[in-house]
Amino acid sequence: MSKSSGGDSKNTLYCSFCGKSQHEVRKLIAGPTVFICDECVELCMDIIREEHKTSLVKSRDGVPSPKDILKVLDDYVIGQQHAKKVLSVAVHNHYKRLSQAGKNSDVELAKSNILLIGPTGCGKTLLAQTLARILDVPFTMADATTLTEAGYVGEDVENIILKLLQASDYNVERAQRGIVYIDEIDKISRKSDNPSITRDVSGEGVQQALLKIMEGTVASVPPQGGRKHPQQEFLQVDTTNILFICGGAFAGLDRIISARGKGSSIGFGADVRDPEARRTGEVLRAVEPEDLLKYGLIPEFVGRLPVLATLDDLDEDALVDILTTPKNALVKQYQRLFEMESTQLSFKEDALRCIALKAIARKTGARGLRSIMEGILLDTMFDLPGMEGVEEVVVNKEVVEGRAKPLFIYSDQRTSADGASA
């Protein structure tokens, strides 16, 4: 319906789709016989955009262009343009290698595995998860912290290939064209500078085990996982065409890079810039293979990851965008929770910037945003279900800083204000 009947609200207009009145939404667009609000328009755009995603990453010859892949990544991941470009080109080249695999050619295209390095909460895992949504090759994510050498308690490296097989419905042909993302790769660094001090089954041992499957080998994969079923037949999977992307925070790597870059100059020409003033992401841009060796990765493992991409720290503007822009942005999530209580939730611009600055101070990146939001809204979410007539809750900078309570706007206040203005 477009208009209500009877009473003082005789001339009030309503959205024909969701039923909200003109006072509950920012904009109401009129058609010949219907009305639609800005929220319904935004929802329709999200649905169309989601359906359009799969067609964006396919071109005429089946190989998506780097620009198409980047365009989709931009919808989900804020900032990190360099890392997104590296991933877009790598995935594009991976598709091209697969399209050339069956053709006779003098030149064999070798794969270029990727290493993503960046501070915690900057979007490494989100980039991988977004790729998984948009690609039409099998994709799996593995956690390096659970891996151990074969024969020890924990997961074998073959379990990574098993997950890829499961993602391809046990189609070996499709699994051999897949992409694997290994998270927390920095956690398998060598635990000691002396390689012979003791057997390192979850550090250097895992690096050694990963070498062959990353370069290309025929791996024997138990279809039921583990070694508990000795009678089962093993599946043979060729890993030559599987692209490996590794990611890690590499905490402390920035100190190794800074130490390498320090000179012993003194006097008037010396650089007296405080190394602490440089942000982690800025320091990581100068990473060299020798820094990774000092961190604890073995030379052979570093050699299997020729493409190196570093991610930047998220600045204030990027964190504000993360709060509001993506489809599943935090602010939208909490607004949906408040809508279930028939209440609108709104944040002032200064409040969003204050939340972003708090997250930067905590050095937890985007991951710190949720805990800050929970702290701000805890009392409100506790009290709201027992309150009646609350139409809107407004959060400003003072609320984020803990100097004030959120502003509650009641429906009777808004009605009286409308009457006064009339």
UniProtKB/Swiss-Prot annotation:
Residue positions binding ATP: P119, T120, G121, C122, G123, K124, T125, L126
Keywords: ATP-binding, Chaperone, Metal-binding, Nucleotide-binding, Zinc
Pfam annotation, one family: AAA_2
Gene Ontology MF annotations: ATP binding; ATP hydrolysis activity; ATP-dependent protein folding chaperone; protein dimerization activity; unfolded protein binding; zinc ion binding
GO cellular component terms, A-Z: HslUV protease complex
Alphabetized SUPFAM superfamilies for the sequence: Glucocorticoid receptor-like (DNA-binding domain), P-loop containing nucleoside triphosphate hydrolases
NCBIfam families documented for this protein: clpX, PRK05342.1
Family of the protein in this entry: Belongs to the ClpX chaperone family.
Subunit structure as annotated in this protein's UniProt entry: Component of the ClpX-ClpP complex. Forms a hexameric ring that, in the presence of ATP, binds to fourteen ClpP subunits assembled into a disk-like structure with a central cavity, resembling the structure of eukaryotic proteasomes.
Stated name of the protein: ATP-dependent Clp protease ATP-binding subunit ClpX
Native species: Rhodospirillum rubrum (strain ATCC 11170 / ATH 1.1.1 / DSM 467 / LMG 4362 / NCIMB 8255 / S1)
Lineage of the organism: Bacteria, Pseudomonadati, Pseudomonadota, Alphaproteobacteria, Rhodospirillales
